[in-house]
Amino acid sequence: MQFTTILSIGITVFGLLNTGAFAAPQPVPEAYAVSDPEAHPDDFAGMDANQLQKRGFGCNGPWDEDDMQCHNHCKSIKGYKGGYCAKGGFVCKCY
């Protein structure tokens, strides 16, 4: 009776040590360095509205989906057969 109790406690402690429940806490990583905004000029500064609209590949939300535009975009990428608008119509998913 005592042997099984000691064995079960030992297995429990060993299992908790392996899962990291009693492990020492890891140090918190330093905050990421944010670069100066003037060091990287705005990428969209020289683009007109037509160029910015093309970046969504037709998936501009659930009420403004153009699956064919997304499908044609994915077909233009080597290795993909087509695509569709996913994640509520905001993401062009290629297959």
From Swiss-Prot:
GO terms of molecular function: potassium channel regulator activity; toxin activity
A Pfam family: Defensin_2
Positions that bind beta-D-GlcNAc-(1->4)-Mur2Ac(oyl-L-Ala-gamma-D-Glu-L-Lys-D-Ala-D-Ala)-di-trans,octa-cis-undecaprenyl diphosphate: 57-59, 67, 73, 84, 86, 88, 92-93
SUPFAM superfamilies tied to this protein: Scorpion toxin-like
Biological process terms in GO annotation: defense response to bacterium
Effect of residue 88 to A/C/D/E/F/H/I/K/L/M/N/P/Q/R/S/T/V/W/Y: Complete loss of antibacterial activity
Primary site of residence: secreted
Subcellular location: Secreted; Host cell membrane
PROSITE patterns to which the protein is assigned, alphabetical: INVERT_DEFENSINS (PS51378)
Paired cysteines (S-S): 59-85, 70-92, 74-94
Cellular component terms (Gene Ontology): extracellular region; host cell plasma membrane; membrane
The keyword Secreted belongs to this UniProt entry's keyword annotation: yes
Effect of residue 86 to C/D/E/F/H/I/K/L/M/N/P/Q/R/S/T/V/W/Y: Complete loss of antibacterial activity
More details: In mice infected by S.pneumoniae, it has an efficacy comparable to vancomycin in the peritoneal model and to penicillin in the pneumonia model.
Family classification: Belongs to the invertebrate defensin family. Type 2 subfamily.
Name of the protein in question: Fungal defensin plectasin
Organism encoding this protein: Pseudoplectania nigrella (Ebony cup)
Lineage: Eukaryota, Fungi, Dikarya, Ascomycota, Pezizomycotina
